[in-house]
C-alpha cells in the first residue's frame, strides 16, 4: 500500500509543482495519474522513489516513511519505466535486461535464468533477442526491454512515466495491454503517468486527475465519467468521445 500525505514540491517562489497531495494506492491496484502536461504528474511519481525530494509531506510504502529508507535501497525495490527507455547501446538485450541483477552481485547463472524468464514475459523470446543490440530493435521492442529491466529485481511496485507515449498507435496499444497482463499476472502495484485519457480509462482501476499541481478527483473511470467533480474533469473524460466523433465525421465526409 502506498500513501501520500500532504505531499508538496515547490521550486523557489513559483506556484507549487505539487500542492498538498493526499492519496492512497492499495496493493495490487493499477492507478493512473492523469492530467494535462505540466500538472505535476511526473513530479509526484518521482517523489515516490525519491528521485525528487518533497518540499513538504511524506510518502509511506507499506507503512514505512520513505524518508527513513536509504534512497538507493528504496529505488532498488521499485521498478521505474520512462518514456525514453535509455538502453545502453553497446550492450545486448540480455545485458540491458539483467544490468540491475549484475550490479546487485548476482551470479551469472542466476542472471541468465532470470533474464530468459523476463524476455519471455515481455514477448521477446531469448532465442531471437538475447544477443541483439538496441539499435536493431523497434521502439516497441526497446520499451519491452525497459519493462523487463524494471522487473528484474522482482519489485512489487512499478512506476511508469508515459512509457508508451513515443510509440505508434498500434504498438502503443499492444504494449499497454501486454503490460496490464503482466501487472495482473505478477500482482504488481502500478502507478502510471499519462495525459492520454483513452489509455487512462482502458488501463486504470482508478484515475487520479491532477490540475496545476493539485489532485482534483480520484475514482474509477466509470465514476469520473458519470459524476465528474467539475467542468475540467468532465472535459478530460469526454476527450476520447470528442476525438471519436471527429473521426466519425471525417470518415462520413469521405463517403
Regions found by a protein language model. Name each.
Residues 109-128:
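Conserved ABC ATPase "signature" region
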Residues 66-79, 103, 109, 224-228:
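ABC ATPase NBD coupling module
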Residues 154:
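Conserved catalytic motifs of ABC-family nucleotide-binding domains
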Residues 49:
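Helix-to-loop junction immediately C-terminal to a conserved catalytic motif
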Residues 132-137, 141:
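Conserved ABC ATPase signature
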Residues 218-219, 227:
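ABC ATPase "signature
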Amino acid at each position: 500500500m502506498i500513501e501520500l500525505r500532504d505531499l508538496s514540491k515547490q521550486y523557489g517562489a513559483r506556484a507549487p509543482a505539487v500542492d498538498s497531495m493526499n492519496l492512497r494506492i492499495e496493493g495490487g491496484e493499477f492507478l493512473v495519474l492523469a492530467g494535462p502536461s505540466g500538472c505535476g504528474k511526473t513530479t509526484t511519481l518521482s517523489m515516490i522513489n525519491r528521485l525528487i525530494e518533497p518540499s513538504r509531506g511524506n510518502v509511506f510504502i507499506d507503512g514505512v516513511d520513505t524518508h527513513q529508507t536509504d534512497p538507493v535501497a528504496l529505488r532498488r525495490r521499485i521498478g521505474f519505466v520512462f518514456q525514453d527507455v535509455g538502453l545502453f547501446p553497446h550492450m545486448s538485450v540480455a545485458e540491458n535486461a539483467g544490468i540491475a541483477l549484475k550490479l546487485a552481485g548476482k551470479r551469472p547463472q542466476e542472471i541468465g535464468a532470470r533474464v530468459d524468464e523476463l524476455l519471455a514475459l515481455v514477448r521477446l523470446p531469448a532465442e531471437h533477442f538475447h544477443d541483439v543490440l538496441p539499435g536493431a530493435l523497434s521502439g516497441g521492442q526497446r520499451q519491452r526491454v525497459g519493462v523487463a529491466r524494471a522487473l528484474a529485481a522482482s519489485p512489487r511496485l512499478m512506476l511508469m512515466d508515459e512509457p508508451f507515449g513515443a510509440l505508434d498507435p498500434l504498438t502503443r496499444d499492444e504494449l499497454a495491454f501486454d503490460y496490464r497482463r503482466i501487472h495482473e499476472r505478477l500482482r504488481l502495484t502500478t502507478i502510471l503517468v499519462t495525459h492520454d485519457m483513452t489509455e487512462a480509462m482502458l488501463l486504470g482501476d482508478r484515475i487520479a486527475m491532477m490540475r496545476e499541481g493539485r489532485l482534483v478527483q480520484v475514482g474509477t473511470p466509470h465514476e469520473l465519467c458519470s459524476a465528474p467533480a467539475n467542468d475540467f474533469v468532465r472535459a478530460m473524460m469526454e476527450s476520447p468521445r470528442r476525438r471519436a466523433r471527429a473521426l466519425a465525421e471525417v470518415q462520413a465526409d469521405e463517403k
